[in-house]
Design a protein with these regions (language model features):
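Conserved donor-binding/catalytic core segment of Leloir-type glycosyltransferases
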Residues: 203-228, 234-238, 248-249
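Acceptor-binding helix/loop patch of EC 2.4 sugar-transfer enzymes
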Residues: 52-62, 110-149, 190-202, 211-212, ...
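N-terminal subdomain of nucleotide-sugar transferases
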Residues: 1-44, 162, 240-242
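Carbohydrate-associated surface elements
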Residues: 167, 186
Length: 346
């Protein structure tokens, strides 16, 4: 089978699927993407140039859509080059989030297209307005509604959609759901598995050495910000550290993946400042973002893993924490409840 994948950050959500297809040694796999250093043997990467950013004259509510249509054009141009070289895929699989798939049915009409549908945005009842501490201004609502422009374009294509959880499917309008299949994202259980040996010896994480008698509490997010409950976790530190054997590692950058940054500082610094100058942070480690092996070792050694999120897309780290056997404390939100059953696995 000739598989064509499309994702601006190769391999994106398709890592395990692509590896599985490569291991079958029976398929031709091409991947259109922005240039990056990621590599999977047996996959032919075809790069496209990142489109220039939207002009300042573009209305602020639709700049994201403007960028998406530029990506759609760039990917379609790349696809036409492949077609001129005689390439014809049997199926196209990609992520709709950045608009890259929107013009591909024009290049290869009749070729099945399976698009990853991640989230349909709402101005109420989901992530927006969930946290009373950080209320959205009504002026944000036009921008939030406009974020669905790519979703709505994608739903008009002669194509089918996939989404990884029942909750994510529920964010889409009822009329759209019959065209979207829930395909759960797996975890590589050969890699993400318990490692009891790590509890019997000291484990080094950066400059830290965690001993067998230490109780390790872990938290992981791409960035330490309210969407992923960083404020709740940081404010809980004084309570956690009342036990002298507890050590806490909070993995995540100081950037912003969702929402906006606080003015003149980072969310981490802002919330840590709330604890006061007298707070002893010697048993709290903020390593920033870490490599995958360090992250996996943390999960395997963790005594308690905390996963907090607004009603938004559940992170891969939640799945992987469960796979490694972590005792998970999760936020009581619908995306988490799909993975964590109270009293059974968290």
């Amino acid at each position: 089978v000739k598989y064509l994948f499309v994702h601006q950050n190769f391999p994106g959500q398709f890592l395990h699927l692509v590896r599985h297809l490569v291991e079958a040694r029976a398929h031709d796999i091409v991947f259109i993407t922005e240039e990056n250093r990621n590599h999977i043997e047996g996959v032919r990467k075809v790069p496209y140039a990142r489109p220039r950013p939207p002009s300042p004259e573009v209305h602020w509510t639709v700049r994201e859509f403007d960028g998406a249509m530029r990506r759609a054009e760039a990917v379609a141009d790349t696809a036409r080059q492949l077609k001129r070289l005689g390439y014809e895929p049997d199926i196209v699989i990609g992520h709709h989030g950045w608009g890259e798939l929107l013009n591909l049915t024009d290049v290869w009409p009749g070729v099945p297209l399976l698009g990853y549908m991640e989230f349909f945005y709402h101005t109420h009842d989901y992530d927006v307005g969930f946290d009373p501490e950080f209320k959205s201004a009504p002026g944000d609502f036009p921008r939030i509604r406009a974020k669905n422009a790519v979703n709505l374009q994608a739903l008009q294509l002669e194509a089918h959609g996939q989404t990884p959880t029942r909750w994510q499917l529920s964010t889409y309008p009822e009329w759209a759901r019959p065209g979207i299949t829930v395909l759960p994202e797996g975890v590589n259980l050969d890699v993400c598995k318990p490692n009891p040996a790590l509890r019997r010896k000291p484990v080094r994480i950066g400059e830290w050495e965690i001993g067998p008698k230490d109780k390790l509490v872990t938290y992981v997010a791409r960035d330490l910000e309210p969407y992923r409950g960083a404020h709740v976790m940081i404010r809980a530190l004084p309570h956690l550290l009342k036990r002298r054997d507890v050590r806490v590692v909070m993995v995540g950058g100081d950037g912003v993946s969702y929402g906006a940054a606080p003015e003149g500082t980072t969310w981490r610094k802002m919330f840590m400042a709330e604890l006061g100058a007298g707070f002893d942070a010697s048993r709290v480690l903020f390593p920033g973002r870490v490599d995958y092996n360090t992250y996996l070792r943390l999960l395997q050694r963790s005594d308690v893993h905390v996963y907090l999120t607004y009603p938004f897309v559940a992170s891969w780290s939640l799945r992987e924490a469960l796979a490694t056997g972590c005792a998970v404390i999760g936020s009581d939100t619908p995306p988490v409840a799909e993975f964590v059953s109270h009293g059974r696995n968290g």
